[in-house]
């Protein structure tokens, strides 16, 4: 006599167990993104209070339309990144940091994105009132070294701006 019990469930169950084990181990060893460098708490608080609203004024609406146009279409990602980069440079030069940061976060090429975020942080550090935009840009960078450099610049400028006020 033969044993006719259903035993075909063991192999799929073992396979699922092995896959779950591999996923669990990989999750434990996966590199976590490092925390951005520290900036003064008051500056960080101001940066966290930033709300980007390009719809609030006609100029912002115009920039929003340009950004949407540059980021869409049937062109290569490099072309889109290039058009967005031009918008970032123009808006940072015009102190329109809300549009600069909006366009910069849409850039996919890390080196270009970090370089443009650095330019936003540099432009924002020129004026004490716009320093929170520099922190916003610093948090958008992906390179820890670039973040550290931007953090040092912003912290130094914050101290210069608030010397004697504390």
Q: Positions of the model-derived regions?
A:
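N-terminal Sec-pathway targeting helices
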Residues: 4-18
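Non-catalytic tandem-repeat scaffold regions and their flanking low-complexity/translocation tails
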Residues: 14-166
């Amino acid at each position: 006599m033969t044993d006719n019990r259903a035993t075909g469930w063991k192999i799929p169950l073992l396979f699922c167990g092995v896959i779950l084990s591999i996923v669990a181990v990989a999750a434990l060893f996966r590199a976590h993104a490092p925390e951005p460098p520290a900036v003064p708490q008051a500056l960080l608080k101001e940066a966290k209070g930033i709300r980007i609203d390009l719809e609030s004024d006609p100029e912002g609406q115009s920039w929003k339309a340009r950004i949407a146009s540059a980021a869409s279409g049937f062109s290569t990602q490099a072309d889109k990144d290039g058009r967005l980069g031009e918008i970032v440079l123009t808006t940072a030069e015009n102190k329109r940091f809300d549009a600069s940061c909006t366009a910069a976060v849409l850039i996919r090429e890390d080196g270009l994105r970090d370089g443009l975020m650095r330019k936003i942080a540099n432009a924002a550090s020129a004026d004490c009132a716009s320093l929170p935009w520099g922190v916003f840009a610093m948090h958008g960078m992906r390179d820890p070294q670039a973040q550290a450099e931007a953090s040092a610049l912003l912290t130094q400028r914050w101290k210069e701006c608030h010397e004697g006020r504390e």
